[in-house]
Amino acid sequence: MTEMNATEATEKKSLNFIEQAVENDLKEGKNGGKVQTRFPPEPNGYLHIGHAKAICLDFGIAARYGGVCNLRFDDTNPTKEDMEYVEAIKEDIQWLGFQWGNEYYASDYFQQLWDFAVNLIKEGKAYIDEQNSEQIAAQKGTPTQPGTESPYRNRPVEESLELFNKMNSGEIEEGKMVLRAKIDMASPNMHFRDPIIYRVVKTPHHRTGETWKAYPMYDFAHGQSDYFEGVTHSLCTLEFVPHRPLYDLFVDWVKEGKDLDDNRPHQYEFNKLNLNYTLMSKRNLLILVKEHLVNGWDDPRMPTLCGFRRRGYSPESIRKFVDKIGYTTYDALNDFALLESAVREDLNSRATRVSAVINPVKLIITNYPEGQVEEMEAINNPEDPSAGTHTIEFSRELWIERDDFMEDAPKKYFRMTPGQEVRLKSGYIVKCTGCKKDDNGNMVEVYCEYDPDSKTGMPGSNRKIKGTIHWVSCAHCLPAEVRLYDRLWKVENPRDEMAAIREAKNCDALEAMKEMINPDSLNILTNCYVEKYLADAKPLDYLQFQRIGYFNVDKDSTPEHLVFNRTVSLKDTWSKINK
């Protein structure tokens, strides 16, 4: 973790029960005073905003208490995993501002896990079951009714050992048999009812190739991997609460009764990040990508970290948002407006102010000398004096926002209308004198006169003018494409709504998504103009288009065709773009 992030972590507000648990362990001298966490993503998709909450906790706890957070890829399902996701996950973690101590993979422990499973078979704690998944599920019982024992539950140890080896040799087809832990089919905890701990998967693994055909299940690999690595605090989300007894049991078994009260990982659960108007299941996000409902994993409408990055969110804003919502032991639906507020607050302090006109109409200053060009000084960021200034050219013909002119304006309209003065930001005070329309009544030109003594910085500029508008010089600007992004979904809770649609219409997830998707989630404007200062702007440069919103350069942008993404609109009521 960088020095900045370590400082930020220590300045965060209390992490409540998790922080208290860690502090209690340290006071009691557990784990030799060590704090070690891990972030264990499965490399089967791109990280989303929900993962950011887990990342901030895993790395933040380690930083706060002088420990280490390792990165471990839970690569136990080769059918869905790929090195593309491994590299993308690492990039996202580092972009978010964190650096792991060691990089591990569950596949690093395949041999140890195999040996552990063999030992369980020898001890009579595991057996090969040749029933199919439907039969096994039917025998599970219910939370109030005990399950039914498998007819293979008491098969000879030697037979289970032989079949287990055949599972891994390639002799057994997928779905024909599994290895189950022998625990308690009458346990009130359904996860104790002889859980499957190994299954056959013949898809080559992205790291181990075809070495293995039998793969451990998540519940069997996770706790043991924590133990092998020396994790002290295993942090996960609330759905794993009922898994914790099984986690503890497998750790007890792998430790073979040694040091049960110390030097072992303990699992703690916290609430997931749920956002309204957001769908975060990787399974559903994959459908969006594969069916081209979005333009890839990094589409700025996606809740993926790479999507937020491309849209122009700063890592600091995401960390601040996560810190603001905190960690609890109950689930809640958070308002997306909180995330937007966090990015506005952060970008306000770091974004460079520039001029851009996204719905242009020409303004002609009729008494300004033809051919004259002035360089006006524009402040880069009024919140940060050290950010300096840049120059913007001013001339007789300017582009202004079409919405900044109204021929018959109401009384409280303070922008450009005949007979009224407005201030051209960083320039002069002008008075509107009229306009010109085409044969269809469309506005094509607006006319005004300027006060030569009212240039910004001159004494004449000090008189009170209620309206200020932005502009760019027609002869000194650059054409640009501007992409205005909005919510991808038109329903507040797309997860629940999708379930309701599927049940009501007996349709698949894709059809339900098509019904929920917001047709106005992307509006592309091609007739826009930006000041020349942006000719060298690069992706991840944070910008504020004055009076419009926060933007950044898209990766599709080229010097010949500039493309800007709206990160978030301004909250000001005079913003020219509807939210």
Question: At which residue positions do the language-model features occur?
Answer:
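Core subunits and conserved enzymes of cellular information-processing
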Residues: 240, 244, 248-250, 316-319, ...
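Long, charged, mostly alpha-helical binding arms that flank functional sites
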Residues: 262-342
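Active-site cores that bind ATP or allylic diphosphates and position pyrophosphate for catalysis
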Residues: 71, 75-77, 83, 105, ...
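A glycine-rich helix N-cap at a beta->alpha junction
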Residues: 85-111, 116-119, 124-127
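Residue-level signal for inorganic ion chemistry
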Residues: 29, 58, 89, 120, ...
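N-terminal catalytic cores of NTP/NDP-binding nucleotidyl/phosphoryl-transfer enzymes
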Residues: 13-90, 206-237
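Conserved short loop/turn motifs at secondary-structure junctions
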Residues: 40-43, 72-80, 102-111, 134, ...
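Basic/polar N-terminal segments that are highly enriched at the extreme N-terminus
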Residues: 1-13, 579
